[in-house]
Design a protein with these regions (language model features):
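Soluble periplasmic/extracytoplasmic beta-strand elements of cell-envelope proteins
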Residues: 1-5, 13-18, 32-34, 48, ...
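Extracytoplasmic strand-loop-helix segments at the start of, or within, the mature domains
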Residues: 1-38, 137, 219, 223-232, ...
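Solvent-exposed coil/turn segments that connect beta secondary-structure elements
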Residues: 6-9, 17-22, 38, 65-68, ...
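Extracytoplasmic/secreted envelope proteins and their assembly/folding machinery
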Residues: 30, 42-50, 65-69, 73-75, ...
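Second-shell loop/turn segments in exported
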Residues: 31-39, 54-59, 130-138, 151-157, ...
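Amphipathic, coiled-coil-like alpha-helical scaffolding segments used for oligomerization/assembly
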Residues: 36-102, 179
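Flexible, polar/acidic helix-loop-strand segments at domain edges
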Residues: 73-161
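C-terminal solvent-exposed extensions
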Residues: 175-244
Length: 244
């Protein structure tokens, strides 16, 4: 899960909520925070995240893996910086899944690391990678990296009509409680935002949790400390986008 917000200064913040945070799930006992969506959809997920991190979240956008592939392809792909290890992982994945891709296409292997252009299948596989030594920490960082890349792609067009057309065409792949007017406002706002200025953070922050591997592997989180750090980040942007 990612919380996207804008503070009073108009600065955009992106906060990953790691899936292994252990919480109370009303009516379902205790479990990982990502189970909230399974048990109660977006409404329960918003309620749980709001309660534990002292936020007021009432709007959501949900996109599954296949839909994200379609959305990225609709935009014409994205440009991302990848490491050599990430390149090797991607080539292995696309070779294995090319017959299962949404378009049925054969995806050519990436020939170099660094800045590369990725289609939807490649970009989504990149965000799912947990095998580069960074585990789930790296995965959440790549998710934020992809959202920034999408924002950059949108901003390069500098065309409100194109963006509104993309929003209408992509609507079928998205579940949201945003109304059309709100979607339009956010789309136009995206044209004015500098993706490089988007602040990124991860919850739980380093040093604020312990790993419990007795039974169901999860994070025992210092919620008060994380609420404090999150408030500071959302207000002043003092956070970290480290992958460790």
């Amino acid at each position: 899960m990612i919380v996207l917000s804008m503070n009073q200064s108009g600065e955009v913040r992106m906060t990953s909520i790691m899936r292994d945070i252990w919480v109370d799930l009303p009516g379902h006992g205790e479990g990982r925070i990502n189970a909230a969506t399974t048990y109660g959809g977006a409404e329960l997920a918003m309620r749980i995240v709001s309660r534990y991190f002292d936020l007021r979240i009432d709007k959501y956008v949900m996109v599954n893996i296949k839909s994200m592939v379609n959305i990225i392809d609709l935009l014409g792909g994205v440009d991302l910086e990848i490491t050599e290890l990430e390149r090797l992982y991607l080539n292995t994945c696309t070779a294995r899944t090319q017959w299962e891709s949404q378009s049925g296409r054969v995806i050519p292997p990436l020939e170099h690391s660094g800045l590369v252009h990725l289609c939807g299948d490649q970009a989504v596989e990149h965000t799912r990678n947990r095998f580069d030594g960074g585990g789930d920490y790296g995965r959440t960082a790549r998710q934020r990296q992809l959202l920034k890349a999408i924002a950059k792609k949108i901003r390069t067009k500098k065309d409100p009509l194109w963006l509104l057309s993309m929003a209408r065409r992509g609507r079928k792949w998205v579940q949201t409680n945003l109304n059309p007017l709100e979607v339009g406002r956010i789309a136009l706002l995206a044209l004015r935002q500098d993706p490089n200025a988007i602040g990124c953070f991860r919850i739980p922050a380093e040093g604020t949790y312990t790993i419990n591997d007795a039974g169901s592997w999860h994070f025992e989180t210092d919620f008060e400390k994380n609420r404090q750090l999150l408030r500071e980040f959302l207000k002043n942007g003092r956070g970290s986008d480290e992958m460790q």
